[in-house]
Amino acid sequence: MLKPVVTAILGLLLMGSSGALPAGCDRGERVQLLLEAKRRDASGQAMDKAREVIERRLGAAGASDVTVVRQGPNRILATFGGARDTGPIKALIGRSARLDFWLVDTSVAPGQAAAGEAPPGSRLLAVPGDGPDGRIAVRGRPIVNGTMIVDAQQSFDMSGQPTVTLRFDPPGTRRFARATSANVGRPFAIALDDAVLSAPNINEPILGGEAMISGDFTVESARELAIALRSGALPFDFVVVEERVVKR
């Protein structure tokens, strides 16, 4: 029941609150979004990082004339052109998009996980496609995470289904190779913002530093996830508190 989860999570990540630009918006106008961090105690360093990530995401998504500046202790003002529908853009720049690869704790039975039981050293992650009690237990710390991704692209698997292909940096490649070599035949979980996308078995050691995320993607949803991943994770989520159209 894990594959449908991809669509559900990407719906949250990419579609968010939809909103076409107000009537009369033309090429002489730009969109302004005022974003507020969901954490009131956000540090200046974290806000600087968030500003850079949002700027990269907007550029990678094809927005033009992008300007992203901090406003006060926990707000960011993003101004850009080239978008007729701001719904996907707002969701893309608002969510963390933190990707982690975990080893699954197979000692925890499904019933135990559903009841919220996990042994010391393990934790439970949500599996939205399995209902409100859908959970899976994972061990220790992530094998690799999104900070080790140097590239992410929309691609296709052998059956022609859209996927996202990832490439890790050298430390991530070594860690992924060690973990998969030591755990052939066991499952690992791929989680986006602590929600499990899929939990495939490790059929053989993965030594080349590449991985593929498959599921119920469309070409567009796979492309947007790839943009979010290669642009880097936000340190926390943001919410749009104001949207307006301004003259260039």
Give residue spans per PLM region.
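Bacterial N-terminal signal peptides that target proteins for export
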Residues: M1-I9
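Conserved structured catalytic cores and adjacent interaction surfaces
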Residues: R244-R248
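N-terminal Sec signal peptide cleavage junction
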Residues: S17-A20, C25
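Catalytic P-loop NTP-binding/switch module of NTPases
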Residues: F217, S221-A226
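Non-transmembrane, solvent-exposed regions of membrane trafficking/translocation machinery
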Residues: R27-E29, L34-I202, I206-L207, A211, ...
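Hydrophobic alpha-helical segments of integral membrane proteins
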Residues: L12-M15
